[in-house]
């Protein structure tokens, strides 16, 4: 049950900010974000060694893509392709709009259900495959939103119900000055309301089966990417209350 926080600010110097916690079985092998694919030299992404794809990535044209399993679809299944491939396929495109259009035409029956974010400085889309034989594309409006394993801003989802308003009320990061503290604190939070279960925490304690929060990310995309204004990506290679956020080298 990975979770994304998406802040869209059209017209701002930093129109796209993302925060993400990756929840996974801890023993599933993975590598931190880097240029892992020789046939895709423009892509920086985390590497899932089991499936060969990724859960979160960015290309040199600052298209960002992230994949989340939908409820009840954790892990691989016989006869299904890895959903991590979709992140890489999205990052083959130079614009989020063209990526969303191309991925919407894929055969949904080849994959287990997913939520896929594709965004850039201009547009942001949520591609929803709910297991009903169709991939639906939804535009994500300006403002702050959360997406996990159900619907965008789903008030019935324990984590979104617990944290959406907290993120909306928190101090907005200032990537220009590397100030992310409010969002870092929320990503690291293990608190949840008394009436909720532990999965409502933003940062999940590891369960007996090894499932929990295994890494965390903060991403900022500038309006005019270039040598003088590079995107920012901070990565915690473990639960963010125990591992520091370190910058990812995005230079080609």
What are these regions (language model features)?
Residues 1-252:
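N-terminal nucleophile
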């Amino acid at each position: 049950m990975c979770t994304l926080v998406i802040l869209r600010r059209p017209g701002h110097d930093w129109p796209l900010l993302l925060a993400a916690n990756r929840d996974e079985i801890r023993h599933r092998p993975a590598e931190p974000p880097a240029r892992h694919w020789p046939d895709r030299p423009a892509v920086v992404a985390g590497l899932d060694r089991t499936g060969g794809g990724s859960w979160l990535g960015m290309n040199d044209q600052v298209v960002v893509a992230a994949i989340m399993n939908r409820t009840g679809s954790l892990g691989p299944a016989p006869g299904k392709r890895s959903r991590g491939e979709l992140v890489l396929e999205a990052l083959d495109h130079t614009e989020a709009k063209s990526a969303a259009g191309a991925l919407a035409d894929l055969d949904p029956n080849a994959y287990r259900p997913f939520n896929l974010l594709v965004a850039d400085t201009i547009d942001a889309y949520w591609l929803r495959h709910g297991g009903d034989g169709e991939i639906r594309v939804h535009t994500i409006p300006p403002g702050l939103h959360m997406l996990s394993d159900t619907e965008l801003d789903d008030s019935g989802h324990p984590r979104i119900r617990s944290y959406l308003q907290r993120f909306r009320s928190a101090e907005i990061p200032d990537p220009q000055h590397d100030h992310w503290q409010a969002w870092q604190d929320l990503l690291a939070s293990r608190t949840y309301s008394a009436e909720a279960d532990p999965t409502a925490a933003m940062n999940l304690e590891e369960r007996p089966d090894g499932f929990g929060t295994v890494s965390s990310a903060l991403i900022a995309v500038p309006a005019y990417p270039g040598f003088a204004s590079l995107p920012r990506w901070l990565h915690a290679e473990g639960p963010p209350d125990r591992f520091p956020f370190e910058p990812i080298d995005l230079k080609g």
